[in-house]
Amino acid sequence: MRKKVLFICALFGEISAFATQEPKTLNLENGCIEAVFDAKNGALIRVTDKKSGWEIMKREALGQSFEMLLPMEGTQMTQADRRYNVVKGIKQDNPEIKQADNKITFIWKGLKSDFMDQKADITFKGEVRLTDKGLEYSGEVINNSQLPIEYVSWPCIGEVTVPDKTQPLYHSTRNDQRELFPHFFNQHGYWGVDYPTSTYVLPEKSFLQVNDRERGFMVYHREMPKYMTITSFELIPGYEIRGVNPYEDEIDGEMVRIQFKANHIIFNKPGETSELDPIQFIIYKGDWTKGVDLYRNDRIALTAHQRDTDPKWLDSPLTWRKISIGNGKDLVRYGKEALKGGVDVLLVSGWYRIENGHVLEVLGLEDAITECQSQGIRVVLETNWTTVDRHSAGYRENFRKYVMVDPFDMPYNFHNICPNTPNIQKWVKSEWLKLPALHMADGYMNSDFNHNNKSFMCFDKFHQHRLGEPTLNGIMKIDAEMAKNLAGNTEKVALGQGFVDYQNDIYNGYLVNASDNFYALHRYMDTLIPIMLRVEVRNARKAMNEALLNRMNIVYDLNFFNDNLEDYPNIVKYGNQIEDLRNKYAGYLWNATFNEHHGASVQGNNLEYAVFITKSGKRAVVVVNKSVNDNSKAEVVLDNGKALVYATPESQESKTFNGSVELAPLSAVVIMEK
C-alpha cells in the first residue's frame, strides 16, 4: 500500500512539473505559413511555406531576431569611437514576450553590443502578426540613451534556403532582377562589405520578390512608408569560387547561408521615439505573377492625394512625339509635322529656363500652344520641379544653400535641390503655378530626379526638416500639391516618369523608365493605366513591337541625325500601322485586360507574346518575332478550341488562323478569338 501511495505522489509530481513547464517555442501558424520563434530570446528559428513545402528558414542555430546600428563616434574619431556598432538581438537579455490574437510582441530593454561598456537605455518593441497570407512586422523604438540609432533590421532572418538547387533562385523588384543562387550578385564591392551583399530600396522599387519558377515570397509596405527601407541579402561566409554560391551546408565549420534583413533607416536621435513602418512578408505558390497579384491587390492607395478624374482622351491609343524647343515657332513647326505624320501628342521640353530664382517661359509659347490645339494636336509640357542649372544666372544666391547633402555634409550633386525644404516647396508653387503655358497646355509630365547620385536622404542642418528625411517624402508632397493646383478641368492630364508606383495614385499615367525586360511587369502591376514608351531611332521597330505587346503608347524620340519627322518614313509608317491596328481591334488590344502569358501557349524561335482578355471574355494573343535576321514560325494554342483569326500591322483585314503563322524579323501578329 505504501508503495502505491509513493507511486501516485511521484506521478502527480511529474504531471505538475510538466504542466508548469514553459514552452520552448512560440508559433504563428495557419494554412499558409508556419513561423516558429524561440520562447526565450525571441529569435525566428523556422519558417515554412505550408502550400509548397518550402522550408524558408530551417536551421534553428541560425535564428535571429533583430539588429540595430548605434554609431559611437565623437568629433575627433578617437580609438574609442566605432561607427559600425551593431547591436544583435540574440545577444541581449531575454525579452518580455506577449502572445495574443495571432500576434507576438517582443520587448527588449537595455541594449548593448560587444563594443559597449554598459547598456544603452533603449527599448525596442517588435511585433509580428499572422495574416491570411503571411506575416506583418511592425515595431517601436524608444531611445533614452546618448547614442543615435541609424537603422533597425526587422525582420532579420538568419537564412533563406534554396528550395530547388536544380533551378535559379532570384530576387527582384519592378525594375531589377538578380540571382541569389547559383550565382550571388555582390552589389557593393569587396572592399565595402563583410560578405557578398545585394540590396534593394523600398518603396522606390515597390516590392522585393524572391522566387524560382514554382514558389516565392514578397516583402513590401502596404501603405506609403515614412522611412526608407533597405532590404539586404548576405552570402555567408562567401563564394565557393568567384560569383558562385557554395553547394555544401558548411565550409570550414561555418554554416553556409543567405541571410536576409529589412533595414528600417530611421536616423533616430537621442530622446526620440520612432514607429517602424509595417512591412509584409507574404508567401505564394506559382510563377512571378502570383506574387505580383498579392502586392497589387494588397497595396493601399494614397486616398488623401488621389486624382479626381482621368481625362477621356488619354484612354485611346495615341502616338506621341518627344521634342525640344527654343521658342514658340519651333513648337508650331513640330505641330505641322505631327499633323502630317499621324502624331497625336507633343511632349515638349526646353520650353522654360530658370534665371535669378525665377522660372521663365520661352517667347511665343502660349500662342504656339493655341495653334497646335486648334489643329487637333495636344501639347504636354515636361517639368522638373526641383532640378536647376548650376551654371544659370543667380544660382549661387538662390539655390546653392538648398542642395542636398550626405551625412558628412557633402553635396550629392549641385543641381537637385531639396524637396523637403519648406522654402523650396513654396518656391515650386509660387514660380511654376504662375506660368500661363502650364495652365493652357493639355497637361504636363513631371520628371522627378529619381535619386540621382544616391540622393535618397538629406542631412542639411539648415533645411528645416529631420536629418535623414527621405527625399521621396518631399517629392510626393510637391507632386500631390502641384497635381491638385494644375488640375484645371477634367481633360488636363498630370503624368510622371515612373519614379515610384505610389505616384500612380496622383498621376494619370507615366513614361516607363525601365529596361524592356520589365515592361510586362509594369503593365501587369496596373493593366489599364496609360503608360508611354520611348522609341529611339536605332531600336525603333523593336520598341514599337514592345509597345504593342504591353499596351503602351508609342513616344517617338527621333534625333539620331536630325529631328525632322519626314526623314524617318519607315518608323512613322510602322507607328501609324500599329495605331490603326489598335483602333480597329480596340476591344482586343486596348480596351482589354493584359494577362501576361496566361491562357495561351506559343511555340517558336525568338518569340515573345502577351495575352489580352476582352470585356466579353474573349482572348487575343500578340506575338512578336524578336530576331533581327531570321523568320520564325509561331504556333499558337488557346485552351478552349474556339475559332481564331489573325491580323498584322501591315495587313489588318482578319484572316482565318490555322494554328501557325510565319513571322518576318521584328514583325508582329495578333491572333483573336472570333
Place the predicted regions along the sequence by residue.
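Sec-dependent N-terminal signal peptides
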Residues: 5-13
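Acidic-aromatic substrate-binding/catalytic surfaces of carbohydrate-active enzymes
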Residues: 24-114
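Active-site-proximal substrate-binding groove within the catalytic cores of carbohydrate-active enzymes
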Residues: 42, 272, 476-650, 663-669, ...
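Conserved structural scaffold segments of CAZyme catalytic domains across common CAZy folds
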Residues: 93-101, 105-115, 130, 134-136, ...
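The substrate-binding groove and active-site-proximal loops of carbohydrate-active enzymes
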Residues: 316-328, 349-362, 410-429, 460-474
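Hydrophobic faces of well-ordered beta-strands that scaffold small-molecule active sites
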Residues: 319-321, 346-348, 379-383, 444-446, ...
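Active-site-adjacent "subsite" loops/lids of carbohydrate-active enzymes
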Residues: 365, 378-439
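Active-site neighborhood of glycoside hydrolase catalytic domains
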Residues: 419-507, 522-531, 539
